């Protein structure tokens, strides 16, 4: 992170000004060339080195950026310029933390900046330090209450020192911190204000615009307002196209997959995540873990549990791995382990981190109801309901209805459970949450079966199964098939615990995408040609072929085509 840089000690240098103008235009290569020449021509000019470091950062040339910034820092220190030295120390903290993932080194530079600023009057650099304090508390400790206090200080200092850019980002972080505490409407109002100011031209540094939009998207994700999140992702993509910064593009791609996962658009989600992982492995290996965790969650939902586990091992240390591991335990019919992981996660999350606690509470209540721990489940359901009532978005209200319904079912109050779960389905559908809606339908079907209403239970189960198979949600689809078997055999009402998983899944119809692939195979196209025709990766086509052949119980492409023709699939 950085703020506008003061004028050079020798502004008459034409080459330096050419580099400065190139930075403003986003002409990164020209900026690097001009600023390198300026630094070589005037090696004692700290501003030239500082600007060169900025240009290298835009081009993701981290080592060169750090080298240039360290040179600038030394020159500013030599001339006794504590304010500029502190600014560059903050820029070095950014490089080490964001690009290299070296938190300890980054903290060293933050503390150096803090000491340099201690005796100086309030400035934009002081405001930027408070922004960093807020960011580090949110990222490292997950404590939105403390983060809000830092952000509010940053807003106040920026206003006094007329540091408009950093003040807008501080305002966005204050809003994000409020959302994290469950004060969603208050926080989103601040985020709307910050975003409007950024789009209205009050932000001159493109990085501030980008980070302000990221705060908005993160807040939307926390309250599960993914329609709003998608709108901001599209705006952020336009920004990335304008400024041609690969790191921003990749980060935007990952944020976008949150909405795709929620909406059940998993083919596109998979392509975006695989591309993001490849880009991060190449350009910023230290930042790849977040994308790996999200890909692990997708693989889990697809029923590829072993692959999900492998990805989580690779992403070890990322704070979100515990949540996916708990879900994996549920997929493997191990609610005791799921509950243990979820409880540990909740112990680590502060009470103030209300929206961050929701996912762990959902897992915990589902696990406890499977274990028949009704009183414990009521406690978790009560906390989640309190959060949902405070945040008051449709998706969180639906999550509250689900845990209340599961708890009612575990207490054998099946009519109450059915009503709560049916209301959840409607809310999820209104929020375009295809996967969550289908999963809740299965819960409705279990309640109907427990009430002896087998015909309605069959209808709900078949609808859920169709939706899950269309998405490629194999883990939940297999649960639906097992439930369908039990309802059809008349044993579902007496079986409250999940049935033991069989090694061989029940064969179901092909998804829409699998039928498209099979039709192109019938035309004689290769996987590479199919990928080009459908705008997919070749790897994704391979996966579709493997899945459809497994579903059709055949071992060759020709046999798949023959069966597809026979069964009217193509």
Question: What is each stretch, according to the model?
Answer:
Residues 31, 65, 105-106, 147, ...:
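Single-residue signature of alpha-solenoid repeat helices
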Residues 272, 460, 544-547:
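Residues within the DNA-recognition helix of helix-turn-helix
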Residues 9, 43, 79, 83, ...:
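Residue signature of alpha-solenoid helical repeat architecture, marking inter-repeat boundaries
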Residues 410, 419, 443, 485, ...:
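Helix-turn-helix DNA-binding segment
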Residues 11-37:
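Alpha-helical segment of the N-proximal tetratricopeptide repeat
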Residues 32-40, 73-81, 94, 111-118, ...:
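Amphipathic alpha-helical segments of tetratricopeptide repeats
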Residues 394, 406, 420, 449-512, ...:
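Linker/hinge segments immediately adjacent to helix-turn-helix/homeobox DNA-binding domains
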Residues 18-24, 47-60, 86-102, 125-143, ...:
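Tandem amphipathic alpha-helical repeat scaffolds
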């Amino acid at each position: 992170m950085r703020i506008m840089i003061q004028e050079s000690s020798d502004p008459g240098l034409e080459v330096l000004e050419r580099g400065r103008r190139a930075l403003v235009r986003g002409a990164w290569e020209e900026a690097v060339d001009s600023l390198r020449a300026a630094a070589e021509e005037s090696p004692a000019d700290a501003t030239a080195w500082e600007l060169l470091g900025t240009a290298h950062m835009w081009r993701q040339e981290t080592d060169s950026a750090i080298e240039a910034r360290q040179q600038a820092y030394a020159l500013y220190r030599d001339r006794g310029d504590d304010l500029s030295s502190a600014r560059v120390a903050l820029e070095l903290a950014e490089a080490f933390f964001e690009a290299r993932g070296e938190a300890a080194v980054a903290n060293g530079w933050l503390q150096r900046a803090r000491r340099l600023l201690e005796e100086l009057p309030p400035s934009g650099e002081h405001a930027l330090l408070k922004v960093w304090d807020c960011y580090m508390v949110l990222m490292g400790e997950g404590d939105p209450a403390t983060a809000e206090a830092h952000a509010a200080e940053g807003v106040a200092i920026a206003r006094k020192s007329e540091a408009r850019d950093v003040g807008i980002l501080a305002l966005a972080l204050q809003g994000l911190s409020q959302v994290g505490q469950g004060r969603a409407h208050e926080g989103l109002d601040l985020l709307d204000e910050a975003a409007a100011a950024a789009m209205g031209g009050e932000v001159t540094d493109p990085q501030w615009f980008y980070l302000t939009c990221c705060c908005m998207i993160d807040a939307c994700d926390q309250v599960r307002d993914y329609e709003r999140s998608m709108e901001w992702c599209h705006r952020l993509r336009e920004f990335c196209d304008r400024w041609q910064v690969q790191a921003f593009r990749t980060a935007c791609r990952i944020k976008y997959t949150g909405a795709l996962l929620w909406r059940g658009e998993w083919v596109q989600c998979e392509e975006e995540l695989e591309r993001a992982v490849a880009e991060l492995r190449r350009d910023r290996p230290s930042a790849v873990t977040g994308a790996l965790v999200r890909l692990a969650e997708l693989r889990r939902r697809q029923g590829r549990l072993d692959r999900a586990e492998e990805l989580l091992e690779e992403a070890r240390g990322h704070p979100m791995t515990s949540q996916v591991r708990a879900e994996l335990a549920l997929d493997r019919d191990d609610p005791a382990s799921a509950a243990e992981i979820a409880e540990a996660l909740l112990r680590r999350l502060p009470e103030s981190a209300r929206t961050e606690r929701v996912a762990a509470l959902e897992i915990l209540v589902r696990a406890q109801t499977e274990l028949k721990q009704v009183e414990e489940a009521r406690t978790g359901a009560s906390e989640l309901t309190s959060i949902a009532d405070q945040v008051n978005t449709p998706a969180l209200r639906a999550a509250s209805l689900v845990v209340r319904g599961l708890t009612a079912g575990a207490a054998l109050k099946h009519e109450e459970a059915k009503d709560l779960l049916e209301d959840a389905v409607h809310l999820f559908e209104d929020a375009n949450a295809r996967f969550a809606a289908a999963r809740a339908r299965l819960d409705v079907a279990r309640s109907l079966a427990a009430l002896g209403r087998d015909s309605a239970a069959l209808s709900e189960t078949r609808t859920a199964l169709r939706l899950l198979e269309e998405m490629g949600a194999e883990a939940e689809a297999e649960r639906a098939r097992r439930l369908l078997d039990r309802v059809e055999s008349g044993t579902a009402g007496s079986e409250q615990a999940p049935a033991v998983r069989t090694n061989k899944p029940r064969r179901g119809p092909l998804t829409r995408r699998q039928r498209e692939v099979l039709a192109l195979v019938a035309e004689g196209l290769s996987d590479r040609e199919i990928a080009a025709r459908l705008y997919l990766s070749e790897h994704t086509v391979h996966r579709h072929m493997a899945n459809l052949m497994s579903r059709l119980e055949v071992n060759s492409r020709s046999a798949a085509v023959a069966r597809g023709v026979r069964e009217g699939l193509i």
